[in-house]
Amino acid sequence: MKPIPSPEPPGQLRLTPRRKDKGEAEWERHRTRERLEATLAGLAELDCLRHRQQLLVQNVLSPGTHGQDAAPTGDSPRSDEQKLLEENISLLKKQLNCLRKRDAGLLSQLHELDKQINDLKIDSEKTEETDSRPSSGFYELSDGTSGSLSNSSNSVFSECLSSCHSSTCFCNPLETSLNLTDGQAKSAEDFLEWLDYRESQHETGTVRCSFSAPHSNSVEVTADVHPKYQCDLVSKNGNDVYRYPSPLHAVAVQSPMFLISVMGNIKAEEPEEEIGPNDNDDCIVPELDHLKDEDSFLHQSSLCSLPLSSGKKMDGYILSIIHKKAHPVRTNKPRTSVNADPGKGILRHGSICVKQTVGVSQSNAVNLKNSKQTCLHSAGMISVDNSTYPSLKPCSKESLSEQLESKRMPSISTYPSCNVNELQSQNNSRNTVKSVCQGLARGSVAMTSNVQKENVTPNAPANLPNASSSVCNGSPRESTQNSALLPQEIKVVPPVKRVSLKNTLLSYHESSSFEERPPLDFKSEGSSSQSLDEGMLVNAHYIPAQQHGVKLHKNTKNVKIVKSSTLKHRADVQYVLENGSQTLKEKSKVVGKKCRFPEDLDTNKKVKKSTPRVKKIVHPHFEPAAVGRNPVAVRSGIKSHGHPKDVVLAKPKHKRSDYRRWKSSAEISYEEALRRARRRVQREMMGVCAQVPFSHASPYAYIASDSEYSAECESLFHSTVVDTSEDEQSNYTTNCFGDSESSLSEVEFVGESTTSSDTDESGGLIWSQFVHTLPMQATATAELQTTAKAFIKIKASHNLKKKILRFRSGSLKLMTTV
């Protein structure tokens, strides 16, 4: 192949495979030479312009006869040249200003682009501060002349686009891609300046004269310059023509943006002069149309810009969509939910909910779905900030009650939350439960003086009952703290939102257990999704027993015992609490999440398998009657025995999975200890406790006689008081109380949880917490105010739970959530 001569265009040099290195060296030399020549040509042109300006200034400053005589002969053409020089100088000044602005604008633009990338949004209005920034690709061109808005070399030429290049001289694909990354709106000031300049061009003919008139002079000055540097430049795309010579040309072509967009592969150093781009574009058209009209040139350039506007519109549209979608609003709803229906999701995925709700009770941003599972208070000791809960209202029927609750619980957040571990470490369960009793008693509007006597400790905040209900997210029963309003509360309970109602009822029972509310009867059975609605509350008061070793874990087997303490004197309450603290410490040794006695493992599995999803028996029309009859049942239940009796919900025996169990040696020793404790305490408490006979709440419910082990069981439950984090783990609680010695041996709590997946893992057995009031015998409502109910939640393993159920107490309400 023939050696490539140096004057050949650089593109051909790169196409020679044999002499690639040599060609590159020659190309570098060629580029350097051309760059120097272009610089020389630019300097020569500038020198020519300087001479013209000097002549103009001299003619202005030295008026005289000589100047006047010379004026008619030779100054008339010079005066035109001087005008042109003035115009060119003004253009140069404008261009320098543009360059200064552009230097500052690029830096600020980079910072803003970084911010935009970080924020995933494009701010198209900040660049109005820097007038000479590159145009955004977001704005379509208003007309052909405003095509400069899409210049990648933008700010250098935007104001004073002289005849050297039109407003869209840089519209090519590469330039378009640069514009897309720009993300900046074109300054209106630059555009207005450019319009003013264009008008001045058309008025004075500056463009044509600047190209044609100084041509001869520039040729004289730059006679030694290569002629190609004196030619107009046509860009690669053929749409842009850069006319020569213009004082603006020498400055504008040095823009790196211009070089990148027009020359692509050429370095930024080449276009030192308007002549440099001629080399780079390889489209040198010698002496191309110097006399072509500026209007026609602008028209051509505007045509170049129009095809790109649609693409820029699309890009702007896409970016605007990105901007809109950048920051979606986060809602209070959880990112993931096990089920669309919060009630069913919690019921059927209790094990999942257990792990989610470990720390829910102390967080202020808890969803209702989690708040339902919040650890209900160990004797009401854990309080949750009420302010978060009224906002969480997935249950439409609880909204009103939540509002009432929020009004009635202004200071719940101030109440310190205490867990059972704190009670253990401090051995302070006595004082804490007393304070709980007092706080709950204060929460009730219609408490009697007897209850006030019980609730003596002044240091307990009065809003504790509300705190317990706030965990349940505004239970409808907390909304009406007054025991006289109990009928309304019962009416609030329809099983529309099952999980939430269950929790609300649970919170209600927690609060009302200290608030002299009557023990409520419930329907015997409930379906899997509704079992939470239909639980059976057992009225109970806790009696201390001897110590038992059970270690309490917050995240593990949670057993809830809702106790409804009857009228007790202060000393008795203190005594109960003292024994409770002892038993609490001992119980802290036993329970692990999977901790089960060997004899109970099979039973737990059978409970899961055998307990069917019981059909729900809902009689909403019975609710008014039940409301009217609750007081009677309460009074009668209080008067019959030394402690209140249970209206226990019994499942048919054929449905019982663990109807009878053989007692282990541990259980037998348990019974003996409980007997001794009960005998000791019963003598002390006998005169204090009122006796209330209970009517049957349902075909399966019957009056609970005073069991031999009721006192021991109560103390056992009291000693294991713990806030439970799972209300919804199980719908039914299998009654394991029944043994030959217990009068309630035949009793069985409402079935096992329908969450069969949960019962294996957590062995959750639960008393259903919802009041579906069956007709109850009418009794006086006076006892509603005198019955102080206490919720005692027990967190226990399967074996402990079964033992507790075996020693079924007549005054206990057991809610096992393990």
Curated annotation (Swiss-Prot):
Biased composition (Polar residues): 455-485
Organism domain of life: Eukaryota
Tissue localization of expression: Expressed in the animal and dorsal marginal regions at late blastula and early gastrula stages. Expressed predominantly in the anterior neural plate at neurulation. Expressed mainly in the ectodermal placodes, including the eye anlagen and the otic vesicle, at later stages of development.
InterPro entries the UniProt entry points to: Dapper (IPR024843)
UniProt keywords, alphabetically: Coiled coil, Cytoplasm, Developmental protein, Neurogenesis, Nucleus, Wnt signaling pathway
Region ranges (Interaction with tcf7l1-A): 1-337
Coiled coil: 79-130
GO biological process: one example: nervous system development
Compositional bias per record (Pro residues), positions renumbered to this chain: 1-10
Keyword flag Nucleus: yes
Basic and acidic residues composition-biased segments: 21-30, 122-132, 512-524
Motif (PDZ-binding): 815-818
Region Disordered: start-end pairs: 1-30, 60-80, 122-144, 455-486, 510-530
GO cellular component: cytoplasm; nucleus
Free-text note on domains in this protein's UniProt record: The C-terminal PDZ-binding motif may mediate interaction with the PDZ domains of DSH (Dishevelled) family proteins.
Subunit and interaction comment: Interacts with dbf4 and tcf7l1-A. Interacts with dvl2/dsh via the C-terminus.
Protein name: Dapper 1-A
Gene it is expressed from: dact1-a
